[in-house]
Amino acid sequence: MERYRDGDAVAFERLYARHKGPLYRYLLRQCHPREAAADVFQEVWSRVIASRDRYEVRAAFKTFLYRIAHHCVADHYRLRDRKRENRMDSVDDHEEALAVQGYEQPEARVSQAQLDDAVRLALSELPEEQRNAFLLFEEGGLGLKEIAEVTGVPAETVKSRLRFALAKLRRALADDLGMRVTLQPARMET
């Protein structure tokens, strides 16, 4: 980011190429409806570009990027909530109700699509702080200290949120899929 700030356009291309996949996966899991992830993704990179001249090295670029993403997701939900308040018959609410009905799968064997749906539903049922910590960890690839910097809480709080999120996800997936689920992140060190 420092090289980009100093005028090296190729440096930005490298940053974008390195971080676009994990960032987009993180946003796909955070944003509802899923189509909103593309808009939030654009907003994140727009803010990175806009902050070019003001950028100061305080942490790793990845931490800087996910802090922006964290704020953009919060802005997305604030805007969505305002729109919902303005219209009582929300199309989104109707779509959510239909989507939840689609998660009831009677088959004993679980297809990848069913597993994806079950994971999406289980993630949506987590408290926001736990979901955010889990997605920053799993999709963003951030460590405990980086998540603590992004979210503004101590690393031990992040660790606690991750443990609660994992326990709830295990239970929810076991209930939904009728099978034992092993979710064990390998890098839960501080």
What are these regions (language model features)?
Residues 1-22, 107, 124, 146, ...:
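N-terminal module of bacterial RNA polymerase sigma factors
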Residues 3, 85, 89, 118-121, ...:
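C-terminal edge and immediately downstream basic/flexible tail or linker adjoining helix-turn-helix-like DNA-binding
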Residues 5-6, 29-32, 43-60, 79-81:
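Sigma70-family region 2
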Residues 5-14, 24-43, 155, 178-179:
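Short, charged helix-capping/linker segments at alpha-helix termini
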Residues 25, 39-46, 59-71:
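Structural recognition of an alpha-helix C-terminal capping motif at a helix-to-coil junction
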Residues 50-57, 67-88, 100, 104, ...:
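Arg/Lys-rich amphipathic alpha helix in sigma70-family domain 2
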Residues 83-109, 185-189:
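Internal acidic/polar
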Residues 120-157:
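Helix-turn-helix DNA-binding module
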